[in-house]
């Protein structure tokens, strides 16, 4: 985990200075390894969430599912990441008709590279709910460090439109 002094974004994480997104490799549901390069040329909505099929994570995933067509129309792809295994992801995806990619990061390598691991309530450590908007050139353009699951999808659509108009 980065020390406080080496983070490349503001403490509030609301408006980062664009910087290269950390490369990653993670397993998809079909067992193939996906990397950041697989998404080059598209905007990526990369979101980290604590656990499949829990209340907040389900609300967030369904919020993104419901606006996926709007996100796709903006040339973006949604990618969700947690430490859950492929079997858990498959059940979560089927139960809630999720229409986007889910990646498994059981060893937390990608999660930690994106600084989505840290202290949570009551001093416990775990996966932090965070979303990164990555440009087609692989630059992190926006970080949501404190995500409210309800309505997050609409928030992402509005921000993608704003970034693309700039």
What are these regions (language model features)?
Residues 2, 8-166:
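Chalcogenol-based redox active-site neighborhoods
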